[in-house]
Amino acid sequence: MAAPPVTPSAHRRGQRRRRWPGYAAGAVVVLVIAAGVLIWAPWRPAPLLQPTGLKAGTATTSSVMFHWSDPASGPPPDKYQILSSGKLVGAVAGTVTSYRVGGLAPATAYQYRVAALRGGKRSPLSAVLTVNTATPPVSAARWQGHWSVNIKIVKGADALRGKGTKGWVESWHASPRCPTGPCTVQLTGDLNRHPITATLTRAGAVYTGKTKAKIFQCGKPADAVPIKATLTIQITLRGGQPSGHAWVASAWDGHMMIDSPYTSTSTFYCNAFSLTTSLSGSF
């Protein structure tokens, strides 16, 4: 009997599927290219995008607010960090795209950057945003500190004799009678080499007050007697500037009336006279 024909056993050639680390057998990694834009498959970690679109918002004399755009694609980050001068100043949840900073100085520029965080990783920092606190009115400035005061006689100088009768410079000090902000001021200093003290009340940017002081002498130096004059002072603040977190006066001017009464002794006398002076204060 003839032997049966011999035929090879049929075997299906197996297809080897490449397994990607971290994914189960049968999973397929897909990178779709649509209209030239790469779209990551949902099982791949979404890229952590740099925050963009920073814009200034509402500002007050002591605070600023700014905001930025949502991520262009993918989920929001876990949170955002806010930095100024390289230092962390705050953080918000990843669903929040605005931030307010308080306790700032008035009329001052500040710079901020934002970074996104997810899974312990941080995105590149955003572009720098410069924001400015609002400038208060001059009337809100606190008048304080030492001042160099330029005094010029604009009327009545003929009643005086000696050098410097047309004008001179004195040193005055303004001491507010409140812990912060503008208020009544005690003014101290010298006038014609004699001390003066005056209390000036405030009305907006204008301060007014009266005082008496012995600033002139009647008679020759050997037997002169003091003249007790009445000083009427009016000061108007002309500028302000930040000092720390306060808003303080940076310049002022005004005028002072000096009314000297008739003064006499048993051997001589001085007629009454009045002077009108201009005042200008600077640091």
Residue ranges and their predicted role:
Residues P42-P76, P106, K121-P136:
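Pro/Thr/Ser/Gly-rich low-complexity, intrinsically disordered linker/stalk tracts
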Residues D78-I82:
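Short beta-strand elements bearing conserved aromatic residues within extracellular beta-rich modules
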Residues V138-G164, Q186-L191, Y207-T211, W252-M257:
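Tryptophan-anchored aromatic micro-motifs
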Residues H11-P45:
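Hydrophobic single-pass membrane-targeting/anchoring helices
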Residues T95-Y99:
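Short S/T/G- and acidic-enriched coil/turn segments that sit immediately N-terminal to beta-strands
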Residues D253-F283:
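Edge beta-strand at a domain terminus
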Residues G164-G239:
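Predominantly extracellular/secreted and cell-surface proteins with exposed
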Residues V101-K121:
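Beta-strand-rich modules
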